[in-house]
Amino acid sequence: VTTLNTASGAPVPVGIDKNKVRGGPPRSEITRTDRWWIQPLAIFLGLVAFMAYATWAALRNGHFYAGNVGRDYLSPFYSPCLTNSCTTNGYVWGGWSWWRLSPAIPILIFPLSFRLSCYYYRKSYYRSFWLSPPACAVPDAGSTRETGPRAKYSGETKFPLIMQNIHRYTWYFAVIFAGILTFDAIAAFRFHNGIGMGLGTLIFIVNAILIWAYTLGCHSCRHLCGGGLRKFSSAPTRHFIWKNFVTKLNEHHQLFAWLSLFWIAFADFYTWLVATGAIHDPRFF
């Protein structure tokens, strides 16, 4: 039970209706008349589409490097290079000749853990997959305050959701991988007969930019730059970065989350098309 204050300042008790879910209206009285379900449905379809493609791409274990056609393009799903399949580009990050499965499997653990624990993605799949809640002023699906899964709702304080707190640590791995993908973008200027630039080079440059925009706009990065300060004047450099750079990126964090997600898939697909010979990568110079 909580209280509200009237205009006169007198407290007014507010009871809890057993037919209401946490924070939402009665199940039979959803007052929203707009198409509130479009956003969670679109997010659901978008994430399912990416997961389906990423699963295929990670398990195909082939044609992830276009060195066979004179292009130094390495799929971001398979970067850094862990096998001899991409040694012609001059760098191998580990002798994984003993690894019989797709090298994308151990690689994707790190960026996947970063995105799964991301504040924006958490909101997205909580709403679109778990319907918890599906939208503002819309009740959770399948339970009330007294019955069903939500009756014992504990937020992110118990296992497994307490593991979402690793996000602040996975950010450091995300920075490393952003650096690796930047290296790949630079390497994409190398051709078998010298320095040049192809359409794939441009795709990898955009990929690195979007990854950095998403990573540096992360809430954990924003806290790292501006958190723990009693006054900003004591750390003017951190305050400048926090206010003029990280916060600006954070304001568009949702946009960069989606753009970087699908551009990674696009970069992988383009590399696969070039490596298989399905298309010719046009060279600008």
At which residue positions do the language-model features occur?
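Membrane-embedded alpha-helical bundles that constitute the cytochrome b-like, heme-associated redox core
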Residues: T2-F285
